[in-house]
């Protein structure tokens, strides 16, 4: 039987011979990590066995290079991967750690379910509950919260989640709300944000979910992002960087001149609405910016304007100045999420 694919996506990998960092399509399997030069490649460029390997995160071997994790194999070979942002790295770290633990214990990898262990009523459909929580009108309101000189965008508080469950009569009391919330967390419908909730979720606290206004959580597809506050009040950000970050990640972008496709890290901001793109392997300055106010964004099934690059999951942004940008997501779901987020941003601010 083929090993199960646990997680896949773009990460930047450090070369093992030369000190170069390049974006790779990385696939986490139950027994190892495969990395490909392109998502469409049939055979991997390399494979890292996980049996006996150790994981180091955060890895601070490279100074300014953020969100790096290190895997050391039994042969003492180090492999370094860099994620686009903190939450992406944390998600990879959680799954790699769990895969290594499952190999050690001779178990199959499975997303942890607390339904049986906490005697959750069979009548509760966590998927349906999640959709109710995300309802724009009746669901939980996402907040921008500040703590320890960090701003947490699009997040929820532990006590806020339980308040909502109680007020909507979905649970009889806060204790029952705590059980349901722990299940939502373990099934991946909620993610921990910030040290307090992460430590609890990792098993340091008695309950993996905390009924506290200081414990922060977020929906996995909400555009959550945590950013450091500048302590220097004299720093005036350029206008286009003032907006709140609502989504980020890697996409393929077609060049305007040569029409070739390259992996780029994208950061979407609203009010003012800008989409900045970067070389994912380095450099803090963007390669370019797309002003989204009044733009049109649509999915593209096939187009003579698009030089063929495995034509699935393409979408196009046409700016108010009629500049065309062609982008490609890794999956249909990811394409839909980006289109929706860009449409929302394009209607805000300047």
UniProtKB/Swiss-Prot annotation:
SUPFAM superfamilies (UniProt xref): PH domain-like, Winged helix' DNA-binding domain
UniProt GO cellular component terms: cytoplasm; ruffle membrane
Domain of life: Eukaryota
InterPro entries (alphabetical): DEP_dom (IPR000591), PH-like_dom_sf (IPR011993), PH_domain (IPR001849), Pleckstrin (IPR037370), PLEK_DEP (IPR037371), WH-like_DNA-bd_sf (IPR036388), WH_DNA-bd_sf (IPR036390)
Pfam families: DEP (PF00610), PH (PF00169)
GO biological process: cortical actin cytoskeleton organization; hematopoietic progenitor cell differentiation; integrin-mediated signaling pathway; intracellular signal transduction; negative regulation of inositol phosphate biosynthetic process; negative regulation of thrombin-activated receptor signaling pathway; phospholipase C-activating G protein-coupled receptor signaling pathway; phospholipase C-inhibiting G protein-coupled receptor signaling pathway
Residue numbers of N6-acetyllysine PTMs: 64
Keywords: Acetylation, Phosphoprotein, Repeat
Keyword Ligase: no
Domain DEP: 136-221
Gene Ontology molecular function terms on file: phosphatidylinositol-3,4-bisphosphate binding; protein homodimerization activity; protein kinase C binding
Entry function: Major protein kinase C substrate of platelets.
Protein name: Pleckstrin
The gene coding this protein: Plek
């Amino acid at each position: 039987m083929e090993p199960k694919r646990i997680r896949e996506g773009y990460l930047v990998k450090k070369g093992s011979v030369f000190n170069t960092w390049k974006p790779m399509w990385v696939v986490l399997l139950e027994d190892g990590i495969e990395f490909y030069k392109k998502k469409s490649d049939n055979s991997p460029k390399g494979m890292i066995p996980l049996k006996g390997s150790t994981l180091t995160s955060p890895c601070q071997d490279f100074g300014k290079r953020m969100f790096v994790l290190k895997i050391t194999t039994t042969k003492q070979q180090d492999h370094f991967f860099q994620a686009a942002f903190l939450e992406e790295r944390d998600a990879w770290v959680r799954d790699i750690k769990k895969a290594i633990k499952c190999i050690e214990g001779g178990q199959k990898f499975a997303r942890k379910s607390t339904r049986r262990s906490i005697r959750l009523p069979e009548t509760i459909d966590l998927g349906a509950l999640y959709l109710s929580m995300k309802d724009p009108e009746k669901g939980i309101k996402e907040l921008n919260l500040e703590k320890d000189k960090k701003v947490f965008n699009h997040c929820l508080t532990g006590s806020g989640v339980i308040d909502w469950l109680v007020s909507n009569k979905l649970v009889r009391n806060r204790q029952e709300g705590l059980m349901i919330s722990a299940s939502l967390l373990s099934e991946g419908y909620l993610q921990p944000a910030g040290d307090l909730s992460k430590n609890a979720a990792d098993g340091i606290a008695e309950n993996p979910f905390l009924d506290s206004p200081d414990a922060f959580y977020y929906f996995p597809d909400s555009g959550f992002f945590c950013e450091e506050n500048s302590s220097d009040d004299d720093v005036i950000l350029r206008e286009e960087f003032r907006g709140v970050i609502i989504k980020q990640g890697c996409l393929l972008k077609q060049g305007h001149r040569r029409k070739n496709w390259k992996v780029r890290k994208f950061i979407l901001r609203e009010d003012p609405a800008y989409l900045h793109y970067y070389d994912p392997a380095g450099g803090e300055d963007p390669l370019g910016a797309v002003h989204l106010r009044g733009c049109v964004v649509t999915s593209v099934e096939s187009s003579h304007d698009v030089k063929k690059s495995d034509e699935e999951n393409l979408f196009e942004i046409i700016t108010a100045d009629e500049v065309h940008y062609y982008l490609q997501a890794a999956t249909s779901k990811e394409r839909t999420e980006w289109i929706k987020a860009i449409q929302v941003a394009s209607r805000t601010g300047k």
